[in-house]
């Protein structure tokens, strides 16, 4: 099984980029002289970028990297725009070594030793960098996007009760109920005997589960068989838009503009860009669901509270739906394309379920090989493939023998760590057994981040992935249409699709 990028002309992310920028600019300028406007804009951006380098460059000058990256963040922004940032950074590490300059003030450190330094705890630990400002929703930083430690601690205390062990135990029956809706739709595909894109249905499932948690009621994508949601932006009439496309465009735009401060300023000042429209659409979706489910009134004194809750709800929908749906799709694909793993896992699941074609989460979680298979899928695919940005604290820090002054941007590339031969031995092989061999492998799994800013919802994600994959494998025989999995990257690394055919066991 290989992970393969599609031809450049077919990249879904390139279409995202065109939708985010080019059509809107044509609309604004009436299609006249768009090339000149774009060229002038790029020249101005390059000039400002180089000027910015001279003003803020702080990090060790001797660290090598691509020539353009030494002088401007546009090298990294370009690869993010093309949906191949993690590949470009990985290639740079293969050429230049453990430490690579991927921006004038941004050093990528491909070393396991760097994880505890860059993503560590305590008052001297690096904080999130300005990169995360591009993810701010509704003008209110969420638990994910806030850079302030105290604000993050406050938000985490407020939100953490929803992800506590007791709260998740109460939520498990609701997850199983939603999985029931999911299997009803899969049964329909069984009867047809046709290939279908299960990634879409994983997305619908994730949205329904997370909206139930965030708002107290499901959006209902599984039942309607569509991700169309009603959106009404300020001053506009109500329209129906695809929620998955909104998530993809918003997340991809944020991953690009967060790299460069001038891009953030320019893009934020252009509300007509469809990437910004995607952001406003998600904010409106979260606000409407919140008001409908919880009875909030935006005209009341609680309007600020609604904005705060909307920011958290939108963050939960985006991060949760992307992580779980993509991870379930690639893990199912890895299982189905590795007969040895498929046969071994099925034997263990059938034994644990006493030969039945269904099992509870409580039963499934006690099958260690299932969780090992999920961890291996998370490692090999690397749902979060990029390095998560941090800023060196006041007084600077020492990492891997190098001193970095205050404000230096640092990151550890998740894809490169997940495919490190010294760590894994055979990193390109799908081998779940590595997670059961007694090694401390879990500390190098970066799918949910690392340290005090790691994803607060990762336990919920595991509950969902374990429950869903156990259900599918016990209930159906799975056949994939292609041995290759084509992927793209925004902030998350995701498959373009996952075509399978099911038959009942």
Kindly give the residue locations of the regions a language model identified.
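N-terminal membrane-proximal hinge/A-helix region immediately C-terminal to the signal-anchor transmembrane segment
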Residues: 2-154, 176-185, 205, 278-284, ...
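Conserved, non-catalytic sequence blocks in retroelement Pol enzymes and Pol-derived host proteins
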Residues: 60-64, 81-83, 165-169, 361-368, ...
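Cytochrome P450 I-helix active-site segment
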Residues: 68, 172, 176, 232, ...
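Cytochrome P450 heme-thiolate "Cys pocket" and heme-binding signature region
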Residues: 157, 314, 319, 360-365, ...
């Amino acid at each position: 099984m290989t992970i393969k990028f599609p031809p450049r002309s077919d990249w879904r992310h390139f279409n995202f980029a065109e939708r985010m920028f080019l059509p809107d600019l044509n609309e604004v300028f009436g299609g006249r002289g768009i090339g000149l406007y774009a060229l002038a804009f790029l020249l101005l951006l390059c000039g400002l970028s180089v000027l910015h380098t001279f003003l803020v460059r702080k990090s060790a000058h001797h660290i090598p990297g691509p020539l353009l990256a030494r002088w401007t963040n546009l090298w990294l922004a370009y690869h993010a725009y093309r949906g191949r940032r993690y590949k470009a950074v990985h290639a740079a590490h293969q050429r230049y070594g453990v430490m690579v300059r991927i921006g004038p003030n941004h050093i990528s450190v491909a070393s396991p030793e760097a994880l505890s330094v860059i993503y560590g705890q305590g008052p001297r630990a690096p904080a999130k960098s300005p990169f995360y400002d591009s993810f701010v929703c509704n003008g209110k930083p969420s638990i994910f996007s806030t850079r302030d430690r105290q604000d993050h601690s406050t938000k985490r205390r407020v939100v953490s009760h929803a992800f506590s062990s007791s709260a998740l135990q109460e939520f498990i029956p609701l997850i199983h109920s939603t999985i029931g809706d999911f299997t009803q739709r899969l049964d329909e595909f069984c009867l047809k005997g046709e290939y279908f894109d299960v990634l879409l249905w994983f997305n619908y499932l994730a949205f329904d589960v997370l909206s139930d948690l965030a708002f107290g009621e499901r959006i209902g994508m599984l039942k309607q068989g569509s991700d169309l949601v009603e959106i009404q932006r300020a001053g506009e009439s109500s329209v129906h838009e695809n929620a998955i496309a909104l998530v993809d465009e918003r997340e991809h735009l944020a991953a690009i503009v967060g790299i460069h401060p001038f891009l953030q300023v320019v893009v934020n000042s252009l509300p007509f860009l469809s990437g910004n429209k995607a952001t406003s659409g998600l904010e409106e979706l979260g606000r409407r669901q919140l008001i409908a489910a919880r009875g909030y009134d935006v005209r009341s004194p609680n309007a600020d509270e609604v904005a705060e809750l909307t920011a958290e709800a939108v963050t939960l929908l985006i991060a949760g739906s992307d992580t779980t749906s993509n991870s379930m799709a690639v893990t199912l694909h890895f299982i189905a394309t590795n007969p040895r793993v498929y046969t071994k896992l099925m034997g263990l699941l059938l034994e644990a379920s006493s030969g039945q074609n269904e099992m509870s989460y409580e039963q499934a979680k006690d099958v260690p090989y299932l969780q090992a298979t999920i961890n291996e899928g998370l490692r090999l695919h690397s749902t979060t493939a990029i390095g998560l940005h941090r800023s060196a604290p006041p007084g600077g820090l020492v990492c891997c023998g190098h001193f970095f002054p205050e404000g230096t941007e640092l990151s550890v590339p998740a894809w490169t760590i997940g495919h490190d031969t010294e760590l894994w031995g055979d990193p390109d092989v799908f081998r779940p057994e590595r997670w059961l061999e007694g090694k401390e492998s879990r500390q190098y799994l970066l799918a949910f981040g690392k340290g005090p800013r790691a994803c607060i919802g990762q336990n919920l994600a595991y509950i969902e992935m374990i429950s869903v994959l156990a259900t599918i494998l016990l209930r159906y025989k799975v056949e994939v249409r292609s041995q290759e999995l084509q992927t793209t990257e925004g902030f998350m690394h995701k498959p373009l699709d996952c075509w399978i055919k099911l038959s009942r066991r």
